[in-house]
């Protein structure tokens, strides 16, 4: 049985220690807070020195404005800051820090010393946070914050720290996040007086390359879009560079590293049908919004934000990243860093009068025997005949094309290797020109860089899938009214969501209305999804709307159905194709968005350069 204790004012030290428990978790937390102060002070060069992974010492020196000696006591006091003065400034804050409690919190759990000199000062001044004494010191213009023996006076917190190597790794992660957001600042990191990292001022793209490596930058696609007061810049990796862990995901909102579920959901939507399995995309994205339209004061460590219009942010990010990922098939071959090898030319070139057709081997009267076992079958034209009177916009007709719309389909008795009217250089096409088929599954092609191997079913599946999506996107989504509305029990907040987003849901072909204080009636659904679990779909859509203010679930469900249709409507393995049909597929891949991956996120083609092939045969070694 507890006895009642009188209410009492907490001592300042205990208040700071409680605040430190929310903000200071480990040495990396200390480093983050000090680095943010240096950035707010206008630093252009920052040096970090660590000992014991940051447990024994963290010293951060910058060349910023410096702190006048009369303000040093305020720098280590609670709730004292130069960043804001009023509520209106808090609501549109653009600085990294604004609460004025970081240094006071650090001083309550460690030994803190600050040496600072303003740019026009005669000398530096030093303050010991534990005693509050100020004394003259030597030092260049700027500020040095020295933190020693973290958590020595709080043993309960100290025992939760990991090894020095682990804590150093967390400090390095914190530094990388801040360095990526501030490419204009030079950073140097020392651990036990040994240089670990050095990044010079650079443009954002070069800083990303410096911090995350050339491999990341080589697999990344640029993003740079601005619409009114919102903009998104940075890099997102190609789906083929997806990772098993979400350890290379950096999102910055107005220069602040955050973890935001609205933007994360938007990115998952953009990558929805190009990632395989549980693979995770990698990205460095800088989202810029009006500071008054985002609340950064929602998390003790400022790791989370709240957008005024999360739905608009979700749609913007999803569309911009989706457009970046929507490169056409073979674009990677054009973006490759290594130049195409010089063609190997014979010592005696052919006479100039030699016609292109003469340079080709004569076509056999009958198709050659397949190099793989296959059952007897008659060769059918790959492009289906278009029935008379059927509109070309009929989405069902999109199962057909591999050749151009006006092309004449191949017939069974046409020679397979008929010579084209002219030799088309493989340099004109990223995926090159077809050479033949392998085991009825793969297409071999030659392009300017070397050899291309295409999974013909996966490639055609993506082509048909994108055509189906495009056909439906160009027309209003058909809806089906339900003869008997589906009524289900719902919480009051879900009923409110159904009312709030009724117009947006109606545009998607989904009509649901409250039928009581705790029930919702679904009266119409998108026609493509009418055979599914309507109640489950409605609940999932409302869950998305409540979480991020937007829902891509209807589109994802529709696309899942179209993906299945495309899979069944695509060319199957062991289907013999003519050279013309193979080239038609390659050309369609080059004209189709996201054709580098199938609908399930697997690659549709791979490239071997001539140098890669030379290495296999030890040529030039």
From Swiss-Prot:
Q: Which InterPro entries match?
A: DNA_mismatch_repair_CS, DNA_mismatch_repair_MutL, DNA_mismatch_S5_2-like, HATPase_C_sf, MutL/Mlh/PMS, MutL/Mlh/Pms-like, MutL_C, MutL_C_dimsub
Which key words are in the record?
Answer: DNA damage, DNA repair
Q: Does the keyword DNA repair apply?
A: yes
Name the Gene Ontology biological process terms.
mismatch repair
Q: Which GO terms describe its molecular function?
A: ATP binding; ATP hydrolysis activity; ATP-dependent DNA damage sensor activity; mismatched DNA binding
Q: Where is the composition biased (Pro residues)?
A: 341-354, 364-374
Q: Per the record, what is one GO cellular component?
A: mismatch repair complex
Where does the signal peptide begin and end? none
PROSITE patterns named among the record's database cross-references = DNA_MISMATCH_REPAIR_1
- Per the record's keyword annotation, is DNA repair included, yes or no? yes
According to the record, the residues making up region (Disordered) are 329-381, 403-422
Q: Which SUPFAM superfamilies match?
A: ATPase domain of HSP90 chaperone/DNA topoisomerase II/histidine kinase, DNA mismatch repair protein MutL, Ribosomal protein S5 domain 2-like
Q: Which family does it belong to?
A: Belongs to the DNA mismatch repair MutL/HexB family.
Q: What does this protein do?
A: This protein is involved in the repair of mismatches in DNA. It is required for dam-dependent methyl-directed DNA mismatch repair. May act as a 'molecular matchmaker', a protein that promotes the formation of a stable complex between two or more DNA-binding proteins in an ATP-dependent manner without itself being part of a final effector complex.
Q: What is this protein called?
A: DNA mismatch repair protein MutL
According to its UniProt entry, this protein's organism is Bordetella avium (strain 197N)
Q: What is the lineage of its organism?
A: Bacteria, Pseudomonadati, Pseudomonadota, Betaproteobacteria, Burkholderiales
What gene, per UniProt, encodes this protein?
A: mutL
